[in-house]
Amino acid sequence: MTSLAGAVPRMMRPGPGQNYPRTGFPLEVSTPLGQGRVNQLGGVFINGRPLPNHIRHKIVEMAHHGIRPCVISRQLRVSHGCVSKILCRYQETGSIRPGAIGGSKPKQVTTPEVEKKIEEFKRDNPVSSISRILRSKFGKGDEEDIELDRKEQEESEKRAKHSIDGILRERAPASPESEEGSDIDSEPDLPLKRKQRRSRTTFTAEQLEELERAFERTHYPDIYTREELAQRAKLTEARVQVWFSNRRARWRKQAGANQLMAFNHLIPGAFPPAAMPALPTYQLSETSYQPTSIPQAVSDPSNTVHRPQPLPPSSVHQSSLPSNPESSSAYCLPSGRHGFSSYTDSFVPPSGPSNPMNPAIGNGLSPQVMGLLTNHGGVPHQPQTDYALSPLTGGLEPPTAVSASCSQRLEHMKSLDSLSTSQSYCPPTYSTSGYSMEPVTGYQYPQYGQSAFHYLKPDIA
């Protein structure tokens, strides 16, 4: 940056006199060392320094009186990990002194009584003169060696306290009172009970019923509710608290599973295969589709193409089938909107006199079949529109070519009981150019329900 003439350039970074608040650090507490911090429980600690010995003594004493570690942690405001580690080390070694972090656990080879004897022997006899004492006892008792040992012992006592030997060597306390008040050498002589694994609690039916009723009222009972419930169910308050914690976890798991099942029902592809009923395949002729050769083309099995069409459960209509299993077979054609129309091989005549039948179609049928079809012209009409069918391509016309399709409910026709296998047909109107089903305003065909009709045998036609 360019500055004006005579202006003093300013530094972009702040000077040393500017103090900015530090973020991301714990709250500092005014301690003699100025390094105190506060843990989550509100206790003051110094990072990197071991816990003071008087707090360690208090932890061991409270554990000796049967107080749980979690309660000790809250009362002394010491983290639970620190409490458990001190107690575990005291149970293993009998010592509360801070040790090195990590490494293998010290093995308890000697008892605290033996360790005390060893410490007393070390205080009475320095390390450098142990070998000479052993030699004097078991070897030749030279007076010179004894005098040298005494001189070394006197010199060691006169050493300064600030020397390395004076710091590392443990000094003997002056009196028992000072031993009790010592924060370094004293070890609590309190036996701790080994933590035994508690057997799994078994609840009776009455206890479970009482707990479930309380869980229906509230998922998070307070201390008064838990104590009252523990008295009624003859349990401890701690067992009631643990039961509610486990019950809430099980309730959350069940709620998540129910939501997943409800979501799967909303997805069409999530239906199980058992919910999709198996339907027979329909047969559609691929040959030239002349009006007079419709029965022969459909009845010829050599020129047919099988197209299986699965149906969703919502569009399948169960119907009562006739007693003769050979009298009918359902054949369905798909549409673009999951609608399905029946496709059969005989024609149904118009229901009124104003709807004449195509002469070419009528000439291809026998008088007996025509008589049977004209006798059932008074069946009530059930209008149902669906996509049109193109027999040449085997597909569907666009939605504009909508035609009245046959419904899919089966009704047993009394006049066709004598026929072993019969199949009826709802005729579409065929144009001369496309041979497709097109809507014609003058034609209205009677509907016989919502299932397929009986096919007529080829030998009758």
UniProtKB/Swiss-Prot annotation:
InterPro entries reported for this sequence: HD, Homeobox_CS, Homeodomain-like_sf, PAIRED_DNA-bd_dom, Paired_dom, Pax7_C, PAX_fam, WH-like_DNA-bd_sf
What are the subcellular locations of this protein? Nucleus
The Polar residues compositionally biased stretches are 290-306
Q: Any idea which residues the entry calls the DNA-binding region?
A: 34-171, 196-255
Spell out the Basic and acidic residues composition-biased ranges.
148-172
Query: Source organism's superkingdom?
Result: Eukaryota
Coiled-coil intervals, chain numbering: none
- Ranges annotated as biased composition (Low complexity): 319-329
What's this protein's name? Paired box protein Pax-3
> Lineage of this protein's species?
Eukaryota, Metazoa, Chordata, Craniata, Vertebrata
| Name of the encoding gene | pax3
